[in-house]
Amino acid sequence: MLPVEVPLSHLGPPILLLLQLLLPPTSAFFPNIWSLLAAPGSVTHQDLTEEAALNVTLVLFLEQPHPGRPRLHVEDYRGRTLLADDIFAAYFGPGFSSRRFRAALGEVSRANAAQDFLPAFKSNPDLHFDAERLVQGRTRLVGALRETLVAARALEYTLARQRLGAALHALQDFYSHSNWVELGERQPHPHLLWPRQELWSLAQVGDPTCSDCEGLSCPGNMLDSTLLTSGYFGMHPPKPPGKCSHGGHFDQSSSQPPRGGINKDSTSPSFSPHHKLHLQAAEVALLASIEAFSLLRSRLGDKAFSRLLDITPASSLSFVLDTTGSMGEEINAAKIQARRIVEQRQGSPMEPVFYILVPFHDPGFGPVFTTSDPDSFWQKLNEIHALGGGDEPEMCLSALELALLHTPPLSDIFVFTDASPKDALLTNRVESLTRERRCRVTFLVTEDPSRTGGRRRREALSPLRFEPYEAIARASGGEVIFTKDQYIQDVAAIVGESMAGLVTLPLDPPVFTPGEPCVFSVDSLLWQVTVRMHGDISSFWIKSPAGVSQGPEEGIGPLGHTRRFGQFWTVTMTDPPRTGTWEIQVAAAGTPRVRVQAQTSLDFLFHFGISVEDGPHPGLYPLTQPVAGLQTQLLVEVTGLTSRQKLVGGQPQFSHVVLRRVPEGTQLGRVSLEPVGPPVRGLLAASLPPTLLSVSSPFSLELVGQGGGGESLRRTAPQPCSVAPVLLELSGPPDFLTPGSKAPLSLHIVSFSGPQDLDLRTSVNPSFSLTSNLSRARLGLNESAWGRLWLEVPDSAAPDSVVMVTVTAAGQGASQVPPTHAFLRLLVLAQSSKDQLDGPAHSAAPVLPPVSPALLPSTLVTQGRAGGGMAGKAWWGTVGGVLFLLGCTSW
């Protein structure tokens, strides 16, 4: 890669040509899509972050051709809107989704937005280059980039994305909050990312920088054309005489002489006195963001950089293994499946990007083994053997919690055991953690709940002893499969099948009644449709839309291939499957479990948010689940809408979502979806009234629409959602932890639905000392409480290790209020750990700044927020080390 500090004039002709071809003129900007405030045409932090990431990703694809695929040509993108779905389909092939990339980029963008929303961050001038804290801001910026590198090298990519979001926010704020653009600069500051380089010509304490401005727009209020300064915001720190304010409606300092301000956050003079320079500031901020991404790519290398942004359609492979003496067959089955996956997928687009292994053997569990090297994973797995013992129950949920802590989002976790959990008290917390991590958990249990033989037992066990597994599987969108030793190797084949990125098709009705038919829809964008059934099944029939039926006879039938392994059945339909309504009928003792899955290029992400119209940066406040008493916005982003699909078959249109009670499947309501912005984005929104949702009833989301030819389209999110009774926020320090340190944490809890008497419990993994000044909260309607926690990191803490802090708010006594959890992930960094950014990176790949002021629009730029400009009002999910609420996120 060329040195990041090399000016554009030093870039070679081929690179300049590349830049000219990729970047369209400014007129191609997408406008703001939310009309919460009047700032049309503003460019947001999310816009800048995602456009820069797409530019650098495309350059990586151009420079590193995929083996076996046609080389991408930059000319193919001349004059076109750059879409993540398009470049992924071109690079990996049709049918390979950009979903993981978009989800990872969403993590970065939400962490970016957190800097403007969270109380611990939004008022700190060092994090925003405010109050002439330019040197301190640069220290924070460089520190966040270093921490991004450290976390990525420790394979903690979630934390790395959070620190990257914080770094990009500060970097982008520099160009909006300082007067760099007013000084006539149109390129990024050449020294801002290099800590040993001086920031020249800084305004000093006694230097007046602004004149008084009475109006909203203040184009000529800068006094000196050579000194670098930034504006003061609010009353802390107080603005000295003669200094500039940030400005805008919510800045109290802007009413004190000299009045006005210099921020370029938006196109609205109500919020940005230098609004006329907004686009110029955005253009330079985009160049700087591309420079930062390119720097990380050069430091990490292409493989690790791709993992940082999840530039892959593949998931991770995560095993939780019971290693007691009776588990020999199960361990061998796990080894066989892991070996098969490694051998079949190595070097392909679906090669797992990450491998996680957690053994458990009562009374212990762990340690966790994580690697990105398949050979190392196989070697470690091959060392595991059944260790003797065999008392039931086991510490399964503790091991699963450890796996969830280290498994990347949007992954499958497979638990092999023949015992019930000894640590069933962790059930609710693990359920919540699966939602927070968006991981699907499948239990393969070689134990019949009614069987009495087998392991030794310390006491008589309840027939409901496996219910914790059922609850966790249901909450995560997974399943519990009971089988026997002789079938485990065949049943374990679902490990590889599930990792193919399958979607679950909605059934009507969702819960099977023996003897009653159940239907599901197949559309032309589905393939490898598979029906899985397990239970005491005596017979079944599957009927296609053409009226062709297939029964339980094993082998290849008129519809597909039927296989049976004890009480576990699979029917894989012959491709291409007939489109239309299919019917299943099952005869069984008890309630059979039926699941229909398929591969598809069309899927969706969804998130929640609430409107916030006060504060310095109004917008949509991100939530991971609805909150009781609050009007919630549901935001849907359809993935897999490539340009080719739109031209050939017409663009799919989704009209509404259906909310169903879980697990009964009864319909709670149907909510219309409204398109937001241009159709090319596939962005839809709906308002969920508080009366529609209940704290006591989890619900599922089903997306309903039509394809280009009028066929029915239905997609369902596998993880059910729940409504939080209170808003619970947990935030940590802006920096990483170090051994021997004591870190302050902040807790905030609010009730919007009425009186709440809550007990607050805390836990830490690993078991570090944690103290809190808030153990109970009695809240009335719209009342809040604040708490302070102190986390002590021992001198013996392992560097590059993850610490997870959990706070649980539960109703007191016999209260029926379900608990709400907040999770905070932190990284312990050795005091000597440094990844210096002391000089430019040297590599063969080009940086991708434009030769003319412009931004590259993309489908990922879906969050234009009115009135915020670059204020970072992304509207969904977990942000910057903080989980607002544990609950429903997209699968």
Curated annotation (Swiss-Prot):
A GO cellular component annotation in the UniProt record: extracellular region
Chief location bin: secreted
InterPro entries, alphabetized: GBD_Hemicentin/VWA7, HMCN1-like_VWA, VWA7, VWA7_N, vWFA_dom_sf
UniProt keyword terms in alphabetical order: Glycoprotein, Secreted, Signal
Annotated ranges, domain VWFA: 314-499
Region entry Disordered, spans: 238-273
Location within or outside the cell: Secreted
Signal found in the keyword field: yes
Tagged with keyword Signal: yes
Tissues where this protein is expressed: Expressed at low level in many tissues.
SUPFAM superfamilies named among the record's database cross-references: vWA-like
Signal peptide segment: 1-28
Taxonomic superkingdom: Eukaryota
Pfam families reported in the protein's UniProt record: GBD_Hemicentin, Ig_VWA7, VWA7_4, VWA7_N, VWA_4
Other remarks in the entry: Recombinatorial hotspot within the class III region.
Protein name according to UniProt: von Willebrand factor A domain-containing protein 7
Record organism: Mus musculus (Mouse)
